[in-house]
């Protein structure tokens, strides 16, 4: 297996999950596989010059986004940038440690690769094994989801995974509140965002 290509595919998979979390939504295992199988055939190894340029540009970009509210778009983007730089530093440590970067020859476009579900599982295993901010969870109805934790916390991800079952949503929220704080949850809480559960269902 080509190491440079595998790293590029890892970045692609992380980006796919991140985009869903940016939209405040989870992605199922099946949907993620479909997206990867659709986009990966054209994914090329990432040039070292591109890696270094983005890695070195992130600190200044992150600095400009500091001192914003925790739930603001700017703060979320700042967290994404920090995680992305950590990902580059971990995944491309060898490439980034090169003392002198020579001009890379332009690569000719290659034909689309054949990507199998088995290869998707290989890339996914590498993503989950690394510290890239990608987390998985299994919902009450045994569906498997993924999310990017710097943009979508584990507790909010669990909340999203119960949206198709208001009873489970209430139970999970009460359990989580009791575990973390602990404190009771007012019954009227569930009538408002992000729950918006019908009062008749709550009662």
Regions found by a protein language model. Name each.
Residues 1-203:
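C-terminal non-catalytic scaffold/interaction domains in large multidomain proteins
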